[in-house]
């Protein structure tokens, strides 16, 4: 498939993704609020915001790796791509551990950070831990996603993300009906992220060029460049 066709498919599928997810979200939000109090939903948003702040502990590797991976794939320089991939994986792995540790420390003081009056502390802690694990998995997945984007497979990503959004919505509905409150939102998100991470790994393994996806040697020069 030519680069132009891939680009056009990427644009079209992006619009389809935006339209369908917006429609589903317009239905899902009020549906969720029919099971969860607005104040409890606010707890979920607050906990998600805390995770976002913790994610600032990343080294900012993803943006640089995206451009480097695209450059290497364009030149078919797979030796350099392997160096960038290995170094990025190690750095993202380090970021994942750092985010996990800080997140676990925050969990110990969650009742001091968030006023849990009127809501089960178990629900708050469980939701926070699930969101934390989701964040860690996402960080570790980022270099793999960047390789696929650099290889101009964004149209496939859009289709997969759309399918996973629907799967996440279905799990959310299921968990809400089972009475899991705000835990439903975090659990369904984690399930979707685990699925997309597994699919991303398989797709990268099936690319026409071979990469060692497990962290190999750490290249200091590449680290400085990134």
Predicted ranges, named:
Residues 1-7, 200-226:
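Interhelical loop/hinge segments that connect adjacent transmembrane helices in multipass membrane
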Residues 1-5, 37-39, 54-92, 113-116, ...:
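Transmembrane-helix boundary and interhelical linker motifs in polytopic inner-membrane proteins
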Residues 4-11, 133-160, 183:
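Membrane-interface junctions at transmembrane-helix termini in multi-pass inner-membrane proteins
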Residues 5, 36-44, 76-86, 97-132, ...:
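Membrane-interface helix-capping segments at transmembrane helix termini in multi-pass transporters
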Residues 6-71, 100-104, 134, 169, ...:
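Signature of the first transmembrane helix
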Residues 9, 13, 17, 82-98, ...:
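Alpha-helical transmembrane segments of multi-pass membrane proteins
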Residues 13, 47, 84-87, 91, ...:
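Hydrophobic core positions of alpha-helical segments in small-molecule transporters
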Residues 125, 129, 159-207, 225:
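Hydrophobic alpha-helical transmembrane segments
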């Amino acid at each position: 498939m030519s680069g132009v066709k891939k680009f056009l498919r990427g644009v079209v599928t992006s619009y389809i993704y935006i339209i369908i997810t917006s429609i589903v979200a317009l239905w899902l939000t009020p549906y969720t609020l029919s099971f969860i109090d607005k104040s409890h939903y606010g707890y979920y948003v607050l906990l998600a915001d805390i995770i976002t702040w913790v994610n600032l502990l990343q080294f900012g590797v993803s943006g640089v790796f995206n451009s480097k991976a695209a450059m290497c794939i364009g030149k078919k320089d797979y030796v350099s791509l392997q160096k960038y991939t290995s170094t990025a994986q190690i750095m993202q792995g380090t970021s994942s551990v750092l985010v996990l540790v800080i997140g676990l420390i925050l969990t110990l003081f969650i009742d001091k950070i968030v006023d849990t009056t009127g809501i089960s502390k178990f629900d708050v802690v469980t939701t926070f831990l699930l969101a934390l694990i989701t964040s860690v998995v996402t960080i570790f997945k980022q270099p793999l996603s960047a390789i696929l984007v650099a290889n101009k497979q964004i149209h496939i990503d859009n289709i997969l993300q759309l399918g996973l959004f629907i799967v996440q919505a279905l799990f959310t509905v299921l968990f809400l009906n089972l009475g899991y409150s705000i835990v439903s939102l975090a659990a369904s998100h984690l399930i979707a992220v685990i699925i997309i991470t597994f699919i991303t790994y398989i797709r990268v393994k099936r690319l026409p060029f071979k990469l060692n996806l497990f962290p190999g040697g750490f290249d200091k020069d590449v680290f400085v460049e990134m």
